[in-house]
Each structure stands twice: as structure tokens, then as C-alpha cells.
Amino acid sequence: MDEPTQSGAGADTRRWWHGTVGYQVYIRSFADSNGDGIGDLIGIHDRLDYLADLGVDFVWVTPFYPSPMADWGYDVADYCNVDPRFGTLDDFDTLVTAARQRGLRILVDLVPNHSSDAHPWFRDALTGPDSDHRDYYIWAAPGPDGGPPNNWVGYFGGPAWTLDEASGQYYMHLFLPEQPDLNWRNPAVVEEFDRILRFWLDRGVGGFRIDVAGALVKDDLLRSNPQIGPWDPTADRYEQWLAFDHLHDVFQPESHDVFRRWRAICDEYDAYLLGETYHQDPQGLADLVPGDGMHGGFWFAPMHIDWEVDKLRRVLAGPIDLVGERLLWAAGSHDVPRSPTRFGGGDLGRERTLVLNVLFSCLPGVPVLYQGEELGLVDGRVPEEAVLDPVDNGRDGCRTPMPWAPGSGNGFTSGEAWLRSEQRADNETAHAQVGEPDSWHSRYAGLLAALGTLPDLVYEPLVWTDGGYGPVIAYRRG
């Protein structure tokens, strides 16, 4: 048997989020309170007892800001308000207060890499090169051939540049053209977001999940990325992205200056600052969440692997020495097929997902459940004619409405859901599972209850061991 090996980066001073479990709410699909088919803040409020009884500690809510919804809310037109489809600021304040009364904290999704093209800043920027907000965004003259300024491609495919015909300049967008990237080398943008953070912190939020955290600052010279493979503009968006070594459009070290600044602000409020740190390399993740920056970052590799023990162990062990308690673990999200679907479907996929969440819960860091994971949900079935995702049809299945009860609408809405999908089976609903000893919900609730009785899982180092036989992942804490 191999000698045990100890693992885990040095611990931060203990904060409220150590030893907690998070829960992601995709607001459009969680609970609709008014029958318009769209989940809303009051709907979340009305389900707080469910979340508290499940045993989670904080709730990350996806964007609810005013938005044209080109990318379902990740195109923000006003960072300090609530879209009427989701409610009002008063509804938000009520949600935060009610959550605190139940021992829950609300984390909001902050989208700082880009705004909507409908944001007043960008509207003003379009009025001309001398406008007050022109430098809030990234503009450049055409390249020598009259086309885009460089070879950057967007994550959703195609060039990362769109021509503003009125001025003859291009603006940069890492995602959709409706999502122009903000210029984080402009101190005015930095100051705007200081105010935005304080606006929500003063309303009592428990912290922020930073969208696209690794991409804020771009190369100041706008240099082209090295091309490492053939680029075909008609290819799959991932193939287009992987044709380049992204040295200049993402992961610039100056982003850390922003995160250190936000860390100081959040520390004033004892708020949790975590990032969507999309990096497949453990060292790359560690570089995104150094000890003096964001309090934590998601490790996404488990969302992109098959169920194979050696590979799974490597993925789990890889970042622990480097990142330790700053890790956030998740089996699913609103951007990937649900893990039971990925891991074989049916009860096999559900069992594997539960095992993965048990592993996450026993490792350094913070596990986060995606809504419905506790019910063992596989991807919902969306008829071809009802597909809505403008970017990737594979995301609709994980975004179908939460099934609260049997029958039409599955208790999500009294109207027609924004995303049409097949009705869930009765035994997939929360109504059928809560309180049933052998249900998936009861298994997850039991896991979370057990975590509260095992302080070694928070305070003791991790020791990897040889399982002694077969394909086994083995370790101990304490």
C-alpha cells in the first residue's frame, strides 16, 4: 500500500462560508409566483423553507437585472435594479431578509466582463468617439485588410469584433455582439463597479459570484493570439475557440488588481467573493484565485469528464494542493447537461452524481448543488420546435423548470412555462420526494445533515491513501 499523502493549500482565517454548502438557483426556471411562466424573486422567497430544510447555507441566484435577454440575463442593461419580469427591488429586499431569518444568505451573480448593448453606457458610447462613455468599452480601428483589428474569436463563435459603421471602429465582445466587453483598463469603469458592489452589499447580500472572472482585462496592445490549429468560421464554437492559444484576450494578470480591490470591499461586509474561474488546468485555477484575491473559484473539470476512476481521482486531486479551501465544487450548472444525464442517465447517473457530491462534500472547499440535483433530475426533454437557447441547444435541457408537484406545469407555474418541456414524472417532483426515506431528496438532505456533525471535514487536512484494491478513490480527513 502506498504511503498516505497529505494535501490541501494553506487555510484562510475561518470565515462563515467554510463548511457550508451552496445552492444555485437559475431564476427563470425555479419558481413562478404570478403565472407568467417565468421564475421570479417572490417564487424564490416562497421556497426558502424548502431550501433551509434541505440543509444548504447560501443561495446563488443567477442574474435578475433589467436585460433584453439576448443571453437570458447575462446581458445587463442596469446593474442596480431588478427586471420587472423577476420582480422589484422591494421583492429582493424581502427575499434577503427572509433568507437571513432562516439562516440562509443570498449571493448575486455579477456580470462585469460585459454589459448589454442596451445599457446607457453603451448607448452613449455609440454616439461617437468623443462621448463620455466611449472608453467604457474596447474600440479599435480596422485591421490592415479592413476587417477586424485582430484574430480574436468570440466564445460563442465568429470574430470577437463588430463594426460600428457610424464611426468606422470595431467594438470587442467575447460573447454575443449584444454583449460588448467593458474596458477594465479605464479607472472610471473600476469605480463604477465599486459603487455597484456596495449597492448590493448595503442591501444585505452575502456575496457575489463573478461571471467570466478570468476575462476582465484584455491585452493593452490588442495583440493577436497565436493560432495553434485550423480555424473554420463554420465549425463548432468550441473548435473555433480551441484553434487559438488565448494569451491576450483572457487571463491577464491585471484582473487580479480588480479582485483584490473587490476582496477589500467584500471583507468590510463579511461577504463571500467567488468566481466563475473557467480553467481546465489546476495551476491556471490557482493563478486565478491567489490567497489575496477572490475568496474562491469554481473548478469546472468535474463537469467535463466521464465516469472513470483514475481520471476522476486526477481531476479531484489536481487543484487541492494549489487551491485548497478556496475551491468550489459543482457537478452541474445552467451551462452543461445535468450530471445524471452525463453519467449514464437513469438511476445509474443519479447514483454517480450523488457519489460525486459526497466526494465534493468531504474535500477541502465548498460544494454547490444545482437546482433539482437533489431530486435526481436528468435533463428535461425540450421539443425541437421549442428550443430557445440562442447559443447552444445543449443548455436548454438543464434549464427546464423545477418540478415542484405532479400535474400540468409541475407546480412551477399556473401558466405556460417560458421554456416548454415534457411534464416530469410524479416521482421526480419535490412534492413526491420530500419526507420519503428512500428518495433522492432524502439522501441529499441526509448528506447535508451529516456534514454538520463532522467538523474534521472542515478543519483537518486531507490525506490521500491507496484503497488497497480495485478502482477506489480513498482519502481521510482527521
Locate predicted features:
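Acidic/aromatic-lined carbohydrate-recognition and catalytic surfaces
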Residues: 2-198, 202, 215-280, 402
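Loop/helix patches that line or flank the sugar-binding groove of alpha-linked glycan CAZymes
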Residues: 3, 16-18, 221, 226-248, ...
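Substrate-binding cleft/loops of secretory-pathway carbohydrate-active enzymes
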Residues: 116-126, 267, 272-307, 377-389
